[in-house]
């Protein structure tokens, strides 16, 4: 194919050369030119033949290489396939041998199973015969026992079951009692250890709160400027703040009196600013009081944020933080509620760590437990209920809401967290020195405790001790039995809960003693 193509190319080249030569002959008639052209044409034809032969040889060699390569590839592929087929044949042969072995094994097992089945059938037949014989013997013995005892089998079975049931109940009762006593002793010991550890690890600073504030004056002349002409300045200040200003003979001091600590703080800041500024008149007073109110609001917000930061509690709603800051200006039996909440939170966290429960959640519940005390008196309800509603409103979890609601038994505690908050609240409020009350209130509370205890029949005397946190009731052994002492203690506790208001809890101890006297003469 390639040789024919080269021949055609040479023919075309020769025709072209002839055409050129013809043109050349027509244009030039000179013999020399014709001879030169013929010679040139002959050379070109010769060169073309040589090139054609070279190309033909190269094409032949390439064709041989292609054929050789194709043959080599075919032989290699054939060899690979033959090797794969041999390997496959070997695997199939091995599988066939394995299948033969398994078939032989299955045949052996089948024979063994058949043999066992025949043996079991024979044993079953023997056991059936023995069972029939045993049932016959049992029936005969039952009849003989019924004749001897005069009871049927059902009656004897009933008596036996009742006896076993009574014994089981008695053993179970003893076991339950032992477990309860052990659990009570262990729980009491463990709870005391945890509370003692919590108290030792936390020692918060505390300063008793009062219902008055004192503002120092640079001189007694300032008192006249504070009062103003015809008392207009002092009236304007009292009207703007809602706090009474007491200006008496106390040197270089003005007393601010009021039960609302927030207003008292506003009045104190306002008066200090007015004294420092020197301009004291009704217009200036209103302006300064407005600025002081803004400063107190900002201080409350910062106090709430600082409390959350100190405890490591995050994600609290800004409104709740503001209410926590407001607790800084609330007191309970002269104990600052803000400091009390921080103390309860720290105690909750310590006890939660000892018990292995969520420390962050315990601190959060402790911090928010008295949230309801930050709300003014316009909102009705106990502070626990109000606090729980606020916590729920601002997205606190149900566990936190329940702990707030249950810390004063407005709801029965149902979680360990709620009981922890109760315990920490009692620890913070009931420790000596945490709370103060007026002497008259204190004495009246002791008298009421002793009066309630003595109002019950059979009580000979009562003594309020431990600052009114415990009462010992002496009873007549002739009128009150040992069994009645527990009932009497519960009745006294119930009456105290109904008729009295008190912080923490009160322990009632009923003491009954029998004295035998004889004289040796």
UniProtKB/Swiss-Prot annotation:
- Gene3D superfamilies per the UniProt record, alphabetical: Hypothetical protein af1432
Answer whether the UniProt record assigns the keyword DNA damage to this protein: no
Q: Which GO terms describe its molecular function?
A: RNA binding; RNA endonuclease activity
CDD domains associated with the record: HDc, KH-I_RNaseY
Q: What class of enzyme is it?
A: hydrolase
SMART domains, sorted? HDc (SM00471), KH (SM00322)
Q: Where in the cell is it found?
A: Cell membrane
State the EC number(s).
3.1.-.-
Per the UniProt entry, what are the Gene Ontology biological process annotations, in alphabetical order?
A: mRNA catabolic process
Cite the HD domain residue spans from the record: 337-430
Task: Show the SUPFAM superfamilies listed in the entry.
Answer: Eukaryotic type KH-domain (KH-domain type I) (SSF54791), HD-domain/PDEase-like (SSF109604)
The entry's cellular-component GO terms read:
plasma membrane
The protein's matches in Pfam families, at most eight in alphabetical order, are given as: HD, KH_1, RNase_Y_N
- Give the record's membrane topology: Single-pass membrane protein
Keywords (A to Z) from UniProt: Cell membrane, Endonuclease, Hydrolase, Membrane, Nuclease, RNA-binding, Transmembrane, Transmembrane helix
Which InterPro entries does the protein's record reference?
Answer: HD/PDEase_dom, HD_domain, HDIG_dom, KH_dom, KH_dom_type_1, KH_dom_type_1_sf, Ribonuclease_Y, RNase_Y_N
All copies of the KH domain together span: 211-271
Describe its function. Endoribonuclease that initiates mRNA decay.
Q: What family does this chain come from, according to its entry? A: Belongs to the RNase Y family.
Q: Which HAMAP family does UniProt cross-reference here?
A: RNase_Y
The protein here is known as Ribonuclease Y
What is the name of the gene encoding this protein? rny
């Amino acid at each position: 194919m390639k040789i024919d193509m080269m021949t055609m190319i040479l023919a075309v080249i020769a025709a072209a050369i002839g055409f050129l030569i013809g043109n050349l002959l027509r244009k030039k008639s000179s013999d020399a030119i014709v001879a030169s052209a013929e010679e040139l044409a002959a050379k070109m034809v010769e060169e073309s033949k040589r090139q054609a032969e070279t190309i033909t040889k190269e094409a032949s060699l390439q064709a041989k290489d292609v054929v050789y390569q194709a043959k080599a590839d075919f032989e290699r592929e054939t060899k690979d396939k033959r090797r794969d087929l041999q390997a496959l044949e070997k695997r199939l042969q091995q599988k066939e041998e394995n299948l033969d072995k398994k078939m032989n094994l299955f045949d052996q097992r089948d024979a063994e199973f058949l043999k066992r089945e025949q043996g079991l059938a024979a044993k079953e037949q023997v056991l059936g015969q023995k069972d029939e014989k045993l049932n016959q013997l049992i029936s005969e013995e039952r009849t003989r026992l019924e004749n001897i005892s005069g009871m049927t089998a059902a009656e004897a079975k009933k008596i036996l079951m009742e006896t076993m049931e009574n014994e089981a109940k008695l053993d179970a009762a003893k076991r339950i009692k032992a477990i309860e006593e052990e659990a009570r002793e262990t729980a009491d010991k463990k709870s005391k250890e945890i509370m003692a550890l919590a108290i030792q690890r936390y020692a918060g600073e505390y300063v008793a709160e009062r219902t008055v504030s004192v503002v120092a004056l640079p001189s007694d002349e300032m008192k006249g400027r504070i009062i103003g002409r015809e008392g207009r300045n002092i009236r304007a200040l009292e009207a703007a703040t809602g706090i009474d200003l007491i200006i008496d003979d106390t040197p270089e001091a003005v007393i601010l009196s009021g039960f609302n600590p927030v207003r008292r703080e506003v009045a104190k800041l306002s008066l200090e600013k007015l004294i420092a500024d020197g301009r004291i008149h009704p217009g200036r007073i209103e302006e300064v009081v407005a600025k002081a109110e803004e400063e107190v609001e900002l201080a409350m917000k910062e106090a709430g944020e600082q409390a959350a930061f100190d405890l490591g509690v995050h994600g609290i709603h800004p409104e709740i933080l503001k209410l926590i800051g407001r607790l800084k200006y609330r007191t309970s039996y002269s104990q600052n509620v803000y400091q009390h909440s921080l103390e309860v939170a720290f105690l909750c966290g310590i006890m939660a760590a000892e018990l292995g429960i969520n420390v962050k959640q315990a601190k959060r519940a402790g911090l928010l437990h008295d949230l309801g005390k930050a709300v003014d008196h316009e909102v009705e309800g106990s502070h626990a209920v109000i606090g729980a509603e606020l916590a729920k409103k601002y997205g606190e979890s149900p566990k936190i809401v329940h702990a707030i609601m249950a810390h004063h038994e407005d709801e029965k505690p149902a979680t360990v967290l709620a009981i922890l908050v109760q315990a920490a609240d009692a620890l913070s409020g009931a420790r000596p020195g945490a709370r103060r009350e007026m002497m008259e209130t204190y004495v009246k509370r002791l008298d009421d405790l002793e009066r309630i205890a003595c109002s019950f029949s059979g009580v000979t005397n009562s003594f309020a001790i431990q600052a009114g946190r415990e009462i010992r009731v002496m009873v007549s052994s002739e009128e009150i039995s040992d069994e009645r002492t527990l009932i009497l203690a519960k009745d006294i506790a119930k009456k105290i809960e109904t008729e009295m208001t008190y912080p923490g809890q009160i322990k009632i101890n009923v003491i009954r003693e029998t004295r035998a006297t004889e004289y040796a003469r």
